[in-house]
Amino acid sequence: MKLKSIIIATVGLLLATGCNSQNKQVKQTNMGKSIVIFFSHAGDNYAVGNIEVGNTKIVADYISEIIGTDQFEIVTHKYDGMAYAPLINLAKEETRKGELPEYEGDVDLSQYDTVFIGGPVWWGTYPQVMFTFFKKHANDLKGKTIIPFTTHEGSGLANCVEDVKAAFAGANVTKGFSIYGHEVRTEKTKVEKWLKGLGY
């Protein structure tokens, strides 16, 4: 009788574990296959000084680590080695003129259901090189979910969500997430909380 009770308890535990694993899998995949598209600026930055890894890349890496997304980094060498003040002046001119700097490589977005889009806030929106990417892929995200995020030092999301909505007509653009650049190295829990709120 004792052996029978042990067997029944063991089977029940295995079934419960299996159900929990199945529920966890559903939770992880209910947003479909995901990718993080981001631009990040290393080097001289406001509030954090000269950094080897850009603030936005740190957040992108958190997202990939926590929920297992792919990544595509929008890379341009136009700003390499620039001090913060001249960089921001250049960014202001690019924004004013609507310039579209070139970036390296590309990505096939057809396989993804959810796309995280992130970058720093420069003059009220994302850096112009991101708009180069937006223009190239303007018709690739119809019916997909876009989740914007920003790193900043006081601008929050600025106009980034509105600009993403304008760039990708027909996509489901969420309200977005922002975090201070000087916090990203110590506040991973904020990213975790945000992702948990999204259902991950």
Task: Describe the residue ranges of each PLM region.
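Bacterial N-terminal signal peptides that target proteins for export
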Residues: 1-7
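Structural recognition of the beta-strand scaffold that forms the well-ordered cores
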Residues: 35-38, 71-73, 115-118, 147-150, ...
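Helix-loop-strand module that forms the ligand-binding subsite of alpha/beta enzymes
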Residues: 82-170
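Solvent-exposed loop/turn segments at secondary-structure junctions
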Residues: 41-44, 76-80, 121-125, 152-157, ...
